[in-house]
A protein has these predicted regions:
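C-terminal segment of classical bacterial N-terminal signal peptides
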Residues: 16-23
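Bacterial N-terminal signal peptides that target proteins for export
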Residues: 1-10
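Well-ordered beta-sheet/strand-loop patches within structured domains
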Residues: 24-26, 30-131, 138, 145-150, ...
Length: 431
């Protein structure tokens, strides 16, 4: 039954090899992915070389056989990515451990913990596969603790509070579907032996993992887009880095923010925050005096300004010391940041670009060694060879006992449900 359901759900999902949009001056900030491209499962394949990989994978052979035979998935060239294999195995383990339990609804009520007795405790015991009548004993405590750990319910304290009861009432099929969605996302990652080296940026976990011959050799925290300015799911080739980059302020911000700051702080704003003004967006545009610009007119105009405002390289620069460029028309790239303290808090706060926790370590990996430092601005440093960057979104991770669920900061799991399962209410057992 599960094979049939997954075939009907997944067979309708096609990979997207999207042609780039016409380039327009946008500054160093992302632009929205077109609404015609459905995010949640599919990548946008920006680079022609990546698109050719996509075409080879649009009709995978024996998808379900590989999924339910992880040994087969490891054999041969172009076998699915190891992340796919781990999540597929995790789905099996989840179904075996949690998918076979009785679907019993537990009514709302007080928190349940060790020593409690009553009808709701009996229902909780039955829901988790135990016989009624034993009360909230040590065995039930251990199972609730395990359930909380797998399903990302904090704190993991063995107490059946409101969140735990709500999760149990949601049913195992909801979570099995979430795993299946993540399995499908992982299938979009490169097959084994496709690339010697590549990077997976997971905006679901706000982490970047560096792969050599399909083995993760390093990982680091990253800051990614917020729920309003999501980092898109896409595959691109990183071709060069730029040392000591300028930050080009988007025309929208020049109109809405820069002009406002000039009104509030005067022309000293440019000196204090290391900005300069250029006549236009041309490659050889001259630097002009800010006092020659009618900032009041820019603020009130319905048109975007044609001048360019950019922040000079230095420790104050929003791009940090290095920017890793990946040609795409969505304005997405990886870069350093001067605000290292931000990595200790909420990491879903950027406008869509990816800020690296340790750009020096990252640069040392992509170049083979850290490039020689230079004081010259905008120094382009070609990579020895292009490095594929896969920007995905995973809300389930492999765990010691199958999988561990993580938050869904972009809400893409709910968005992907109808794409994959339509009106289906349940995901049948893999058994």
């Amino acid at each position: 039954m599960m094979h049939k359901l997954l075939c009907s759900g997944l067979g309708t999902i096609a990979l997207l090899a999207a042609a780039p949009l016409p380039a327009v001056p946008r500054g160093d900030e992302p632009v929205p992915v077109p609404r015609t491209i459905r995010q949640g499962i599919d990548f946008v394949y920006v680079d022609p070389q990546m698109s050719s990989v996509a075409r080879r994978r649009q009709r995978p052979q024996n998808w379900l056989q590989r999924m339910f035979d992880p040994g087969a998935a490891r054999r041969g060239r172009n076998a699915p990515n190891p992340m796919f294999v781990e999540l597929a195995r995790g789905l099996q383990q989840y179904q075996a451990r949690w998918g076979q339990l009785p679907e019993v609804r537990i009514p709302a009520g007080p928190v349940l913990k060790r020593g409690a007795r009553g009808k709701r405790v009996d229902l909780l015991r039955r829901r988790l596969g135990l016989s009624p009548g034993g009360g909230y004993d040590e065995q039930l405590f251990q199972i609730v603790t395990s359930y909380q750990g797998v399903h990302g319910l904090g704190p993991v304290d063995g107490i059946a509070g409101k969140a735990t009861i709500a999760s149990l009432n949601r049913g195992s099929d909801h979570y099995a579907r979430r795993i299946a969605i993540n399995v499908e996302r992982a299938f979009r990652l490169p097959p084994t032996r496709t690339f010697d080296r590549y990077v997976v940026v997971d905006s679901g976990a706000a982490e970047a993992r560096l792969f050599v011959r399909d083995r993760a050799v390093d990982e680091m925290r990253v800051i990614v887009g917020s729920a309003k300015t999501k980092t898109p799911m896409m595959a691109v080739l990183m071709r060069n880095a730029k040392a000591n980059p300028y930050w080009n302020v988007p025309p929208e911000l020049v109109k809405s923010l820069t002009a406002k700051k000039v009104k509030e702080q005067g022309l000293s704003y440019f000196r204090d925050f290391h900005y300069e003004v250029l006549a236009d967006w041309g490659a050889n545009a001259p630097v002009i005096d800010p006092k020659t610009v009618n900032w009041k007119a820019i603020a009130s105009s319905k048109q975007l300004p044609t001048i360019r405002v950019r922040q000079e390289p230095g420790p104050w620069n929003s791009m940090g010391e290095m920017k890793f460029e990946m040609p795409n028309d969505y304005g997405i790239y990886l870069h350093d940041t001067p605000l290292k303290e931000k990595f200790a808090g909420d990491r879903w706060i950027s406008n869509g670009c990816v800020r690296l926790e340790d750009y020096r370590r990252f640069a040392g990996w992509v170049f083979g060694r850290m490039p020689l430092e230079t004081s010259q601005p905008e120094q382009i440093i070609p990579l020895p060879r292009p490095v594929p960057i896969y920007m995905t979104y995973l809300t389930v991770a492999p765990g010691a006992y199958g999988v561990v669920f993580r938050p869904d900061p972009y809400g893409l799991d709910a968005q992907a449900m109808p794409q994959m399962f339509g009106g289906q209410d349940r995901l049948a057992s893999a058994a």
